Amino acid sequence: MYLEQIKAELNEAATVLNKFINDENNMKLIQQAALLISDSFKQGGKVLSCGNGGSHCDAMHFAEELTGRYRENRPGYPAIAISDVSHLSCVSNDFGYEYVFSRYVEAVGQKGDVLFGLSTSGNSKNILNAIKAAKEKGMKVIAMTGKDGGQMAGIADVEIRVPHFGYADRIQEIHIKVIHILMMLIEFEMAKTE
């Protein structure tokens, strides 16, 4: 009944993943992002993560695995997903949704922290504002984008881009794979100092 559609979906996902893997620069950027986060943790910094929709869930997933665990039992790492409903609804109502993440960064972010922002289009105004606020605070920025990187192209310290121009779900599938690899590398790196 749907076997061909199922196979086509999986084949498309594999094609997007293989294209991402075959760009050696992506491997270097993932390593660079993991080291940037690990260095922040070693110096007392934290990660603030944010995204919209499915990317918001990925931001929460990343923070949860940093504070909780990924594969190994180890001390928790300082991370906050900007997901507090009272904060989001307050700022959305009083200032506008484009400021929900930047207001939090202004309040909680410190020099040496890392902003981890996800946007499949690279054009999410609230993520762009968060990046601006993070830069003003002296924070480092890791951006996970898709397509051509949108307005986020070139403005982060590290941008990991999935150059897929179809539906956003394919981009998000690579983003979560990258998040899991980042977790593995961060755990490897932090184990050197624990």
Swiss-Prot record:
PROSITE patterns: SIS. GO terms for cellular component: cytoplasm. Gene3D superfamilies: Glucose-6-phosphate isomerase like protein, domain 1. InterPro entries: GmhA/DiaA, Phosphoheptose_Isoase, SIS_dom, SIS_dom_sf, SIS_GmhA/DiaA_subfam. GO terms for molecular function: carbohydrate derivative binding; D-sedoheptulose 7-phosphate isomerase activity; zinc ion binding. Pathway: Carbohydrate biosynthesis; D-glycero-D-manno-heptose 7-phosphate biosynthesis; D-glycero-alpha-D-manno-heptose 7-phosphate and D-glycero-beta-D-manno-heptose 7-phosphate from sedoheptulose 7-phosphate: step 1/1; Bacterial outer membrane biogenesis; LPS core biosynthesis. Its EC number is 5.3.1.28. Binds 1 zinc ion per subunit. Substrate binds at N52, G53, G54, E65, N93, D94, S119, T120, S121, S124, Q172. GO terms for biological process: D-glycero-D-manno-heptose 7-phosphate biosynthetic process; lipopolysaccharide core region biosynthetic process. Homotetramer. Catalyzes the isomerization of sedoheptulose 7-phosphate in D-glycero-D-manno-heptose 7-phosphate. PANTHER family: PHOSPHOHEPTOSE ISOMERASE, SEDOHEPTULOSE 7-PHOSPHATE ISOMERASE / DNAA INITIATOR-ASSOCIATING FACTOR FOR REPLICATION INITIATION. This is Phosphoheptose isomerase. It comes from Pasteurella multocida (strain Pm70).
